[in-house]
């Protein structure tokens, strides 16, 4: 499972001209699901993302989490995070999960966010969406469970 997490001052997602999700200060999470992902990766990624302390404290140091700033979360499904650009000029998306698994784990991710105390605003799986954000910093992180869950911890 992959996420591109951006610290934002605000963000919104629009479908067919209607804003369906909107947040103030918090995290915009673009979420991609791989074909071998399970609920285990989903829970790990949600807990990791929502626990990050990437907001500045009074000393300007990245030390505060969502809870400390009363932050919000906007989650948007993004199968193109599994785009493969190795051959040719047009990306292949065969490395992404199929729609059934992708939607199931996207919905599970949303449920876990809520369970963790951050009811997310969100887009619609498979829809054509327009996403607007005012990035803060900018601070953008790429989280990939294949790397995070399998690499030995550095001391």
Residue ranges with predicted function:
Residues 144-155:
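Short, charged, intrinsically disordered terminal tails
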Residues 114-129, 134:
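Divalent-metal-activated hydrolytic enzyme cores
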Residues 18-70, 80-111, 115-116, 121:
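Compact, glycine-rich, soluble single-domain proteins
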Residues 11:
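RNA/tRNA-interacting regions in translation and RNA-turnover enzymes
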Residues 131-144:
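C-terminal edge-of-domain segments
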Residues 45, 76, 139:
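Residue-level signal for inorganic ion chemistry
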